[in-house]
Amino acid sequence: IPGLTAALSGGAVLGAPLAHDFCVISLSDRLTPWEIIEKRLACAAMGDFCVAIYNPSSKGRPDYLQRAVRILLQNGKSEETVCGIVRNIGRERQQSEIITLRELENKQVDMFTTVYIGNKTTKNIESKMVTPRGYRTV
């Protein structure tokens, strides 16, 4: 949908992963030095933000998602954190999957993939990734 960011469109495919506070981080170091991206990932983990990740991998940087997962784990995210991936958001052959942060470390993704990392309250509810807002227990 024009004007709607991939983070929100892909989030709707997965369920409701980006409720409450969240951030969007690109892993592309073409315009942003990797050291700054590392700091953003660490701060997002320490703040227990839900995170949408753009540009998770490319031919020139095939291991950036794995590096990002390690940074998140080192800074407070649990291996059991609920995560999601959506490929080809809003296009033909759209695919989605809900996994854990531990499983994400070994996933092969590309530039057509948006990755979602939950927070401590994010759950897999009937194959939907849901981050409750805290008004009522789900």
Question: Language-model features: where?
Answer:
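Class I SAM-dependent methyltransferase SAM-binding "motif I" and its flanking Rossmann-like core
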Residues: 1-47
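A contiguous loop/helix-start segment that scaffolds small-molecule binding in enzyme catalytic cores
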Residues: 46-138
